[in-house]
């Protein structure tokens, strides 16, 4: 059996993965501003299969509170419109030829606060994921030191590096959350 080795770059990659997942999750949160990622969860029944919106249309933001969905195939317009209406986003599509316009309504203060709570939940999940990666790294270092593969000084030095990159990624999570919270609360 091969002896496990400590790879700091792998830990960084895994921690960054948690941060990227947070950014993706926060991107799908409705903020009262138009964002193409708002339509990511919507699936369209097309050509005998279910596919994401991005595979049947181009989504653009002509105004801060307006999404424009340019459907590529004229025959798909009604399916896209139906999927938008049936989604839980509460959007009312207005169709003009092959283009569907979606006005993004203002969110109430209560709804904004609910969205901030959801954003905090996502951020906490990301922090926990980063800490799990840190724990995995520290456990491996302790095992390597116990097995005599590295010295106690090396274990301490590497553990300090793991803590440093953990702190950096937690700070990135906090910055991402603060930016999203500001965006949500903006009227």
From Swiss-Prot:
UniProt record, GO biological process: cytoplasmic translational termination
Pfam families: RRF
Keyword Protein biosynthesis among UniProt keywords: yes
Organism: Methylobacterium nodulans (strain LMG 21967 / CNCM I-2342 / ORS 2060)
Keywords tagged on the record: Cytoplasm, Protein biosynthesis
InterPro entries on file: Ribosome_recyc_fac, Ribosome_recyc_fac_dom, RRF_sf
Record's subcellular location: Cytoplasm
Matching SUPFAM superfamilies: Ribosome recycling factor, RRF
Family the entry assigns: Belongs to the RRF family.
GO MF entries: ribosomal large subunit binding
Gene label: frr
Protein name: Ribosome-recycling factor
Main location class: cytoplasm
Function noted in UniProt: Responsible for the release of ribosomes from messenger RNA at the termination of protein biosynthesis. May increase the efficiency of translation by recycling ribosomes from one round of translation to another.
GO cellular component, one term: cytosol
Transmembrane segments: none
């Amino acid at each position: 059996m091969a002896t496990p080795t400590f790879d700091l770059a792998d830990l960084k990659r895994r921690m960054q993965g948690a941060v990227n997942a947070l950014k993706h999750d926060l991107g799908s949160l409705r903020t009262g501003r138009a964002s193409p990622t708002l339509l990511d969860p919507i699936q369209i029944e097309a050509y005998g299969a279910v596919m994401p919106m991005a595979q049947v249309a181009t989504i653009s933001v002509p105004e801060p509170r307006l999404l424009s969905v340019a459907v590529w195939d004229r025959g798909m317009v009604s399916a896209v419109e139906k999927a938008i209406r049936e989604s839980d986003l509460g959007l009312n599509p207005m169709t003009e030829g092959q283009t569907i316009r979606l006005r993004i309504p203002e969110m109430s203060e209560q709804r904004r606060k609910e969205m901030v709570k959801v954003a905090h939940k996502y951020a906490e999940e990301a922090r926990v994921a980063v800490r799990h990666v840190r724990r995995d790294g520290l456990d491996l270092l302790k095992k390597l030191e116990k097995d005599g593969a590295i010295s106690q000084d090396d274990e301490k030095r590497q553990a300090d590096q793991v803590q440093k990159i953990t702190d950096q990624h937690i700070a990135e999570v906090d910055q991402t959350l603060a930016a999203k919270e500001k965006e949500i609360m903006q009227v």
